[in-house]
Amino acid sequence: MLLNLPYEILLIIFSLIESKKFFKLLSINKEVREFILTMLNQNPKSFSFNLKNCNPKDSIKYLQSVRCLNLSKSTINDDQLKYLSDVYSLNISNCKSITDRGLSFLTQVVKLNVSYNGNITDNGLKNFQRIKKINLCFCGKITDKGIENLVYGKTLNSDEPIPTVINTIRKINLQCCMRITSKCLQHLRRARSINMLYGPQTYNEDLQYIPNIETLKIDGLDVSDKNLTNLKYVKYIFFGRNYPVIFMSHLDKLTKLILPNVPEHIEYIDFNKMPNLVKADLSGCINLLDEQLKGLSKVRKLNLKECYDITDVGLSYLTMVKKINISYCFRITDSGLKYLSNADYVNICGCLKITNEGFFYLKKVPKLVVGYTTLSLYDCMIDGCGDYEYLTISDNTKQLITGKAFHYLENTSQIKIINCNNIIDVDLKSFTNLPTLSKIDLRYCNNITNQGLSALCNIPIVKISNNYQISSKGISYLTNSKKISIESCPKINSFPNLTGLKKLVFKTMGKINMQLIQNLNEYYHIDTIHVYYRDFIDRQHLSSIKINDNIHFISDKF
């Protein structure tokens, strides 16, 4: 019987069934219905429903007993919501047919996601009786009065004292709600998590209303030491745009700090007063000093991208870090890398003073990123010892990376080479001596030709994009590949019969070649063939021939 299959497999099967057939399945018998609804309650994020072609009454009645329900991007309307009055957690994000009237039926909901709905106004938030968590992201009509309705069940007069709280809001997302002001914080005193990113500027004095906040995402603050003193329980702070001026102390419980692109006053932060900090994003903080990194000695994940004043001395304090990004820290040299030998991930893109010798210190780092930039900068050399699981190389404009470098990557499993026009066919021969290499990605490497691909014949996963020299003949060399991905290679107009191939992904910038599709029809042994095409391609082209079930056409704007 179907229900005797492993739970994980059943979850995948049921989550892939289209909504109309899913509801028919619920009507088979009580045993099947109870099993599926239990699974639905336990894994609400695995299921989403589109009610467009379903009988509204029949479909919703089966969902009445479900406590956690995901109906995001569906066609559910106000009349259907009245059948879900007892739901505990409901996701109706991006449901354009929902209005204030529909929300009036959800009096008992505890967790609600109604984001991306321009129909919801302040009046729609006054009927909740138990709500604790709500997502109002991109609900552009919500104002401070709506927050009053949410918390007290009514709007307040200017001289009216704050009444008894009806709903104790613990978590609220007001991102991109441009009519909300920081004055609404006085109604969210018991909140533990507030997101007000990309809204109007927040004023310092309003922080006094949220002393119990643990997660705060907020924009445009000019935060002083006095204002932050009240936030003694905060664990995670994300300051958005408008370059906050920060003098942080008293944040001894803070575990995550995201503070990117602060050009001024960053040098005044004393990280020693944040002993519990484990994650910090300080990218673009150009005035960050070496001495400040002493306070980050216990941080496990650290982003110092484009912190131009950081030197090897600063890295000497970071011997315990596990994941670090020091890309475009131009003062870092080979000597500094010896302090990162215990890391699991190191990004050294654009570190122009790092040479071959520096890679000796990184030989035990599982994941190493060298390059991966769209700027016309050249990256560091990689000659030397290397035990890299993942390597990215890009913009090799000064011939710093040649085939010789690849000989040292004996334990590399994935290599990505981007926009390196100095990499030629002969360089790829180095890959034949890398037994652990399982994936290679060649992007914008226009000096690689068909002959170069012959060196990749034993690599399981091969991706080739934006190459104007490789043709169908080159693909024929990939005899042992399990997955091949082709994007924007105009000379590839047919595929050879590669018997070991299990998945093929093909992206075209122009019209779909019918000869190519007929060619693919012959390959039943390939489990999945994805053909991505531009929206402007006439779909009538696809109806002129019979298409095998293993071929899937996907409209893609790329």
UniProtKB/Swiss-Prot annotation:
Domain of life: Viruses
PROSITE patterns, A to Z: FBOX (PS50181)
CC annotations in GO: SCF ubiquitin ligase complex
Entry-linked Pfam families: LRR_6
LRR repeats: 73-105, 139-176, 177-220, 251-284, 285-317, 329-361, 369-395, 420-444, 445-477, 481-508
Domain F-box: 1-47
UniProt entry tagged with the keyword NADP: no
Keyword Repeat listed: yes
UniProt KW keywords: Leucine-rich repeat, Repeat
Single biological process term from Gene Ontology: SCF-dependent proteasomal ubiquitin-dependent protein catabolic process
Matching InterPro entries: F-box_dom, Leu-rich_rpt, Leu-rich_rpt_Cys-con_subtyp, LRR_dom_sf
PANTHER family per record: F-BOX_LRR-REPEAT PROTEIN 3, PARTNER OF PAIRED, ISOFORM B-RELATED
Designated name of the protein: Putative F-box/LRR-repeat protein R542
